[in-house]
C-alpha cells in the first residue's frame, strides 16, 4: 500500500502474508473484492458503534452524531490501516466510488437550511478533518488532544443542536 493501489495486487498480498497466490485468489476473486474485504474488516468496529448510536433514533442529525462518536471511540490500529488504504486509493479514482457514496449517505437528509443542520454538517466535517489530519500524518495529534478535539466538537457543535 506504500506504493499506491496499483501496487496492491493479489501477488503482493500473498508475499506479505507468507501464503500462496492461489490461497489469496481462493478467498478473493478479484483485487476489488480484496479491497472491499479490507475495508469491511477495518470498518467493523466503527459500524458496530455507529449502529449502537442510531438504534433508537435514525434521524439524519443523529446519524452525524453516530459518525462522530464512532470515529472518536475507534480502534487506532484499524483506523491507521484504513487510512493507509484510503491514501492508496486516492491515487486510483475508480476505487473511490463506494467511498464517495458512503460519505454522501452519512450526510443524507441533513437539512443545512437550519441552524441544527448547519452545526451537524460542521461537526461531521470537523470529525473528518481531525481523522484525516491524524491518520494521514499531517498533524501530530496525541490521545489527549484527540479527546479534547472531540470534546470541543461535542460541546460546540453537537450538544448545542439538542438544546
Give the location of each predicted region.
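Helix-turn-helix
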Residues: 2-33
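Generic structural signal for hydrophobic core residues of well-folded globular domains
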Residues: 38, 71, 89-90, 130, ...
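Helical hydrophobic small-molecule/effector-binding pocket
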Residues: 52-97
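Hydrophobic/aromatic-rich alpha-helical bundle segments in the mid-to-C-terminal region
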Residues: 93-100, 104-163
